[in-house]
């Protein structure tokens, strides 16, 4: 009997732990159920939906103008980039073109949004692996950019500044001057971050060869943005399928070689420099003679008339009343419009039945595709690497849960 008992080997049992939903490295309300064999991750099960608000369904009950603020609340780190996709989709269904000055302002603020997003990601990624200084420097610069948002739209985050047909109102000359004055000192801050992190031995040990994604895997999983460029593909919608006035802009697409967390960090650092290049070009074009003019279409059946005009014209008052009560009707049809948001390809599939409300508005969030790959990326890594990988995916739960 004792011999029989002696031959029984105890069964090995994996350990299951919860990561989140209130974990400082979860970047929102993420719950990961991790199955561990010692310190090694065997399986990752993301539990999403904790920030689900039914955005797509809510938009169906709203006019096209009332739908715009919902897009600010998706990727709330860079709000105007999402508004851009929805406005482009509606404009293509309406068959209208945004005036050149309106396009330049849109591109300028989309690049500000890209820097807002990358600054947050790069600095919090550093914080996730133990560095404290980068977030303090990064948030100081983000504060200045938030002020530019506020001076254009009145709001630091939920701007609702883009409109179908253009932008809400023109930028004052002093704001354009201040944005230009911000650019060069910011490049120095990027250089300081670069010096602090890029060659740092501990930072490299935590990121090099961690979370490697091959190019084939990136395409199979529906990745976009930095996740694809980190694996070696120069795929950027601003170059591949130019929209607005991006075709005129001179900028480079940084790509990685290894597809690891470190490459994705380097790409985001370089993209911030390229965004500043685009911003400087936008500012120069806004000051040029051909950059003057209206910032939105002058069809008062789509874009509301100005206050001064409403005090003089009865028709303007009628148009204003109709637009803010019933809204405008969009011709029946369906369209897919995508923009290169900071986190990847943000797409809006808009279906109109000819009424004043969208029949269906399907949102394609880049973070959703990236999060579903957490299982295959993390498998075989250590528990400590999970937060580094999650940080390099750049996920925001407003857009994942919608």
From Swiss-Prot:
From the Swiss-Prot or TrEMBL record, state where the protein is found: Cell inner membrane
The record's EC number reads 7.1.1.-
Q: What is its main location?
A: membrane
Q: Keyword Acetylation on this protein?
A: no
Mind telling me which Gene3D superfamilies this protein's record contains? Cytochrome-c3 Hydrogenase, chain B
**Gene Ontology molecular functions:** NAD binding; NADH:ubiquinone reductase (non-electrogenic) activity; quinone binding
What top-tier enzyme class does this entry carry? translocase
Membrane topology per the entry is: Peripheral membrane protein
Keywords, ordered alphabetically: Cell inner membrane, Cell membrane, Membrane, NAD, Quinone, Translocase, Transport, Ubiquinone
**NCBIfam families, sorted:** NuoD, PRK06075.1
Q: Give the family this protein belongs to, as stated in its UniProt record.
A: Belongs to the complex I 49 kDa subunit family.
What is the stated purpose of this protein?
NDH-1 shuttles electrons from NADH, via FMN and iron-sulfur (Fe-S) centers, to quinones in the respiratory chain. The immediate electron acceptor for the enzyme in this species is believed to be ubiquinone. Couples the redox reaction to proton translocation (for every two electrons transferred, four hydrogen ions are translocated across the cytoplasmic membrane), and thus conserves the redox energy in a proton gradient.
- Could you tell me which PANTHER family the record lists for this protein? NADH DEHYDROGENASE [UBIQUINONE] IRON-SULFUR PROTEIN 2, MITOCHONDRIAL, NADH-UBIQUINONE OXIDOREDUCTASE 49 KDA SUBUNIT
Q: By what name is this protein known? A: NADH-quinone oxidoreductase subunit D
**Which organism is the protein's source?**
Nitrobacter winogradskyi (strain ATCC 25391 / DSM 10237 / CIP 104748 / NCIMB 11846 / Nb-255)
For this protein's source organism, the top of the classification is: Bacteria, Pseudomonadati, Pseudomonadota, Alphaproteobacteria, Hyphomicrobiales
């Amino acid at each position: 009997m004792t011999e029989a008992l002696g031959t029984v080997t105890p069964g090995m049992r994996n350990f299951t732990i919860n990561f989140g939903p209130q974990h400082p490295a979860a970047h929102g309300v993420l719950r990961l159920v991790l199955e561990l064999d010692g310190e090694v991750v065997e399986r990752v099960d993301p539990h999403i939906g904790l920030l689900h608000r039914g955005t797509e369904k809510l938009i169906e009950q709203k006019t096209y103008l009332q739908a715009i603020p919902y897009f600010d609340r998706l990727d709330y780190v860079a709000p105007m980039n999402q508004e851009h996709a929805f406005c482009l989709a509606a404009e293509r269904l309406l068959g209208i073109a945004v005036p050149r000055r309106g396009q330049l302002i849109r591109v300028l603020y989309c690049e500000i949004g890209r820097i807002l997003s990358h600054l947050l990601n790069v600095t919090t990624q550093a914080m996730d692996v133990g560095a404290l200084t980068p977030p303090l420097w990064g948030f100081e610069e983000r504060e200045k950019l938030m002020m530019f948002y506020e001076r254009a739209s009145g709001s630091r985050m939920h701007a609702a500044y883009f409109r179908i047909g253009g932008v809400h109102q023109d930028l004052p000359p002093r704001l354009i001057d201040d944005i230009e004055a911000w650019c060069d000192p910011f490049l120095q801050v990027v250089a300081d971050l670069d010096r602090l992190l890029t060659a740092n031995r501990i930072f490299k040990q935590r990121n090099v060869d961690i979370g490697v994604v091959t190019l084939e895997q990136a395409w199979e999983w529906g990745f976009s943005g930095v996740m694809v460029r980190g694996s070696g593909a120069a795929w950027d919608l601003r170059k591949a399928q130019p929209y607005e006035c991006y075709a005129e802009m001179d900028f480079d697409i940084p790509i990685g070689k290894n597809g690891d967390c470190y490459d994705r960090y380097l790409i985001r650092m370089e993209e911030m420099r390229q965004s500043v290049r685009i911003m400087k070009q936008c500012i120069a074009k806004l000051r040029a003679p051909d950059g003057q003019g209206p910032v939105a279409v002058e069809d008062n059946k789509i874009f509301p008339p100005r206050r001064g005009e409403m005090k003089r014209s009865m028709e303007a008052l009628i148009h204003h009343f109709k637009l803010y009560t019933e809204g405008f009707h969009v011709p029946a049809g369906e369209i897919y419009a995508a923009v290169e948001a900071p986190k990847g390809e943000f797409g809006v599939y808009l279906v109109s039945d000819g009424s004043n409300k969208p029949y269906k508005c399907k949102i394609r969030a880049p973070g959703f595709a990236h999060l579903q790959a957490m299982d295959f990326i993390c498998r075989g890594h250590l528990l400590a690497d999970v937060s580094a990988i999650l940080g390099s995916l750049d996920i925001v739960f407003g857009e994942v849960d919608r």
